[in-house]
């Protein structure tokens, strides 16, 4: 919906729309509206999504990018998505945006700006995925703590930063899984995400939604990895305490 077209977007749309950017956009808008109605019929309360970004190519601010250009990008997202949000409101369904590179909200401050642009409309919340924050240098559980009231869904996904003096954070146009990269996604528990701190923040907030395993470790067998990841989530997902440790000696 919100992206500027390039040939890769043809892969998401019907074949007959290939190379027709505005027709693809309109198809995507109607698809998202239909998804809201389908979710309502199925009793689904949250749909995860991407919004896209018309300004992702400006993330580096060179060639020179003006504040007005960036603001226009955020306003374009508001313009394109408001009619979609209206349908979700009518259906009693909420959207959860995965904060993710290439999206209008990809880190802490861009997420804050998006929510402000949308006047903190409750229709749109966050699909929290720590793996995309870790390699950017954002501490996942602190992001979670600050945006916890907007977290509607949680991805359990790990990543490892392996900078070695030659590699960088931008991927080097090298495929995921290649050991020359400066970071890669890892099976749960094999990366740098502190999931215990994440669970503690979720428990403190009373989050009772899904912990959805997203598994993308190119260096591990999928069946072994998925089995191990499921066990990892069960282990780390401890229940919150129902009392304080010193309640027995309170003055009440």
Residue ranges and their predicted role:
Residues 71-192, 241-245:
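Acidic/histidine-rich catalytic cores of soluble enzymes
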Residues 222-243:
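C-terminal helical cap(s) of enzyme catalytic domains, especially alpha/beta-barrels
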């Amino acid at each position: 919906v919100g992206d500027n077209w390039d040939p890769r977007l043809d892969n998401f749309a019907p074949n007959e729309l290939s190379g027709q950017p505005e027709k693809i956009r309109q198809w995507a808008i109607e698809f998202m509206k239909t998804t809201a109605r389908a979710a309502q019929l199925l009793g689904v309360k949250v749909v995860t999504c991407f919004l896209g970004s018309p300004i992702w190519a400006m993330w580096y601010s060179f060639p020179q990018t003006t504040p007005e250009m960036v603001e226009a990008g955020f306003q374009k997202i508001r313009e394109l998505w408001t009619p979609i949000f209206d349908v979700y409101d009518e259906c009693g369904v909420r959207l959860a945006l995965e904060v993710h590179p290439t999206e209008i909200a990809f880190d802490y401050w861009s997420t804050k700006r998006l929510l402000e642009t949308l006047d903190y409309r409750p229709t749109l919340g966050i699909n929290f995925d720590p793996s995309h924050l870790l390699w950017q240098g954002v501490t996942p559980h602190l992001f979670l703590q600050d945006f916890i009231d907007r977290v509607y869904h949680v991805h359990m996904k790990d990543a490892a930063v392996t900078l070695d003096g030659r590699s960088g954070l931008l991927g080097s146009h090298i495929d995921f899984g290649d050991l020359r990269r400066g970071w890669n996604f890892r099976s749960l528990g094999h990366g740098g995400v502190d999931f215990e701190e994440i669970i503690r923040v979720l428990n403190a907030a009373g989050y009772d939604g899904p912990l959805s395993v997203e598994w993308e470790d190119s260096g591990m067998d999928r069946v072994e990895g998925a089995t191990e990841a499921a066990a990892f989530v069960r282990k780390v997902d401890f229940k919150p305490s129902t009392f304080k440790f010193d309640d027995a000696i309170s003055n009440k």
